Amino acid sequence: MSLSITRENFDEWMMPVYAPAPFIPVRGEGSRLWDQQGKEYIDFAGGIAVNALGHAHPALREALNEQASKFWHTGNGYTNEPVLRLAKMLIDATFAERVFFCNSGAEANEAALKLARKYAHDRFGTHKSGIVAFKNAFHGRTLFTVSAGGQPAYSQDFAPLPPDIRHAVYNDLNAASELIDDTTCAVIVEPMQGEGGVLPATKAFLQGLRELCDRHNALLIFDEVQTGVGRTGELYAYMHYGVTPDLLTTAKALGGGFPIGALLATEKCASVMTVGTHGTTYGGNPLASAVAGKLLEIVNTPEMLNGVKQRHDGFVERLNAINERFGLFSEIRGLGLLIGCVLEAEFAGKAKLISQEAAKAGVMVLIAGANVVRFAPALNVSKEEVATGLDRFALACERIKAGGSS
């Protein structure tokens, strides 16, 4: 079926849960995309921290095509070689001793919360069901995970919500300690809030949560869906802090654009899960696993991870230079190649407008709420692409400073 597609078709045919850009990308290479009209964009959005190696990376294409020529899917009644290799790679690279594969970050977090409840019920009784999460967090869109995420705008239309979930202020250990007690089964936290404003945790905060969980026999869950797989300059952000969780969720960059998620667990935690307690049709399929295995092989090297840290310094240096010219941002923060620019009060609420102006100038950026412009470029983005993209971003900032959009 040959059909001429326009952006207007989205508004005609798709459920209106997104408001996509007015252009349609049709081709990508590295950190560059081209739309239907042939206009080039430097991609600093990265599919929302997904495209770890940019677009159409040759090694990932080769891994996908090689597996696609063999077989695609069997279901969870059978295992496959790519998923077992990937599991061993993750175990060797992290604290984990067991892995559960799924299709997304939301599914990984759903599995983590279910495991935590079962662990507590089996070991301590059904009274131990409380989950402590944090305001402005984001853990996914299932009913359980959207309830754990501390953003009522995403959950208020779906009441009644799952009970026994309470929220503390992020980076406020005293507030968390008032909620964590012997009825708590788990604490779920992002080492750096992504959707909540690109806000890194303090080391003292995460260390304190670890101590509180140990004291009250609660599991500590790190949601590393956005921060994982090299994004911060370590394979996983927990490695920056020297704080090891009981469970860790990962997705987004793990497949480099091919859908895959995973829950990493210690043997002690994983042992409560038995045949039939949880599952997924597509999780750990050979296509996704082959791509993720190749991506992990490329990313988990000193050269790549050190390169992310170096790129961070160059990126932030250029952003600071832009801010010296236009004064739009009160703070530039983040780790590695997850960077947020917080708007000055004068420009409050204009993050979306800035992202739209950036696209007009030929660079794709993200927002993290109404007041933070977010960057999540490919981990292998070149110096030339950074320079070109931020020159274009500077044009957008100049237009905003001048008082509007063009």
Swiss-Prot record:
Q: Which family does it belong to?
A: Belongs to the class-III pyridoxal-phosphate-dependent aminotransferase family. AstC subfamily.
One term of GO molecular function: succinylornithine transaminase activity
Q: Which Pfam families match?
A: Aminotran_3
Q: Does the keyword RNA-binding apply?
A: no
What's the EC number here? Answer: 2.6.1.81
According to the record, the signal peptide region is none
Positions carrying N6-(pyridoxal phosphate)lysine are 252
User: Which GO biological-process labels does this protein carry?
Assistant: alpha-amino acid biosynthetic process; arginine catabolic process to glutamate; arginine catabolic process to succinate; ornithine catabolic process
Query: What gene is it encoded by?
Result: astC
Q: Write the protein's name.
A: Succinylornithine transaminase
Protein's pathway: Amino-acid degradation; L-arginine degradation via AST pathway; L-glutamate and succinate from L-arginine: step 3/5
Report whether rRNA processing shows up as a keyword of the record.
Answer: no
Record's function text? Catalyzes the transamination of N(2)-succinylornithine and alpha-ketoglutarate into N(2)-succinylglutamate semialdehyde and glutamate. Can also act as an acetylornithine aminotransferase.
Give cofactor(s), names only.
pyridoxal 5'-phosphate
The record, for NCBIfam families, names: arg_catab_astC (TIGR03246), argD (TIGR00707), PRK01278.1 (NF002325), PRK05093.1 (NF003468), PRK12381.1 (NF009047)
User: Which chemical reaction does it catalyze?
Assistant: N(2)-succinyl-L-ornithine + 2-oxoglutarate = N-succinyl-L-glutamate 5-semialdehyde + L-glutamate
Q: Which domain of life is it from?
A: Bacteria
Q: Which UniProt keywords apply?
A: Aminotransferase, Arginine metabolism, Pyridoxal phosphate, Transferase
Q: Which organism is it from?
A: Citrobacter koseri (strain ATCC BAA-895 / CDC 4225-83 / SGSC4696)
What the entry lists under PANTHER family is as follows: AMINOTRANSFERASE CLASS III, SUCCINYLORNITHINE TRANSAMINASE
